[in-house]
Swiss-Prot record:
Compositional bias of kind Polar residues: 129-140
Protein name: LysM and putative peptidoglycan-binding domain-containing protein 2
Extent of Low complexity compositional bias: 27-42
Domain of life the protein comes from: Eukaryota
The LysM domain, residue ranges: 65-109
InterPro entries, A to Z: LYSM1-4 (IPR045030), LysM_dom (IPR018392), LysM_dom_sf (IPR036779)
Biased composition, class Pro residues, residue ranges: 147-156
Organism: Danio rerio
Pfam families assigned to the protein according to its UniProt record, in alphabetical order: LysM (PF01476)
Segments for region (Disordered): 1-54, 122-169, 187-208
Length: 208
């Protein structure tokens, strides 16, 4: 079978006849060179975050405490003491196994910092804490030159006084007044008669 060669684009004619340039495909490089260039390009892209000067790989809110290793201690016990994982201690101190802690006199324990950490200029605080902070009410300024809205038409209040079914005339009022006077006179006369009868009864009782 015939071998297919890459297409060679022609170069400009300089007067010395048509010549062919280099092939479209670049020359194959060694594996070490390509790997090193790839790692360098990835490192350049990860050093800075978009729109900020903060480093992506920088530790966020993390500080280290020096712990002195004593006999009988285990990596699990140290991790439980400081509230971290064994993988974090091994990563910071570059330990390959749990038994390697006795090869070092001290260990660096990563703990969370109490200070607020900033990432891309923003605080890493949880949104729950923001809800507890009191919010200031916005100040609303009124424009003096703006025309005031027209007053609303006043609604007449309902009459709370009970309306009588029949209005009393002056004649009816005087008639009722006369009846009350007559009734009071009759009552006074009756009381007087009752008092006279009691006196007569007492006098007759004394005579007996």
């Amino acid at each position: 079978m015939a071998e297919f060669s890459p297409v060679l684009p022609p170069l400009r004619d300089d007067g010395g006849g048509g010549r062919y340039g280099q092939p479209l495909f670049p020359r194959s490089r060694s594996g070490s060179e390509s790997d090193s260039e790839l790692s360098q390009s990835l490192a350049r892209t990860k050093t800075r975050s978009y729109g900020s000067t903060a480093s992506v790989t920088a530790p966020l809110g993390e500080k280290y405490i020096e712990h002195r290793v004593t006999d009988g201690e285990t990596l699990q016990g140290i991790a439980l003491k400081y509230g971290v994982t064994m993988e974090q201690i091994k990563r910071v101190n570059k330990l390959f196994s749990n038994d390697c802690i006795f090869l070092r006199n001290t260990l660096s324990i990563p703990v969370k910092s109490e200070k607020r950490s900033l990432f891309n200029g923003l605080s890493l605080e949880s949104p729950d804490s923001e809800g507890n902070t009191p919010q200031e009410s916005p100040c609303v300024s009124q424009d003096v030159d703006a025309p005031s809205p027209p007053p609303e038409p006043s609604v007449p209040e309902p009459n709370t006084r009970p309306v009588q079914a029949e209005e009393l005339s002056a004649k009816d009022y005087l008639h009722r007044l006369d009846l009350q006077i007559k009734q009071s006179k009759l009552a006074a006369r009756k009381l007087k008669e009752d008092g006279g009868r009691e006196e007569d009864d007492t006098n007759s009782y004394q005579e007996i």
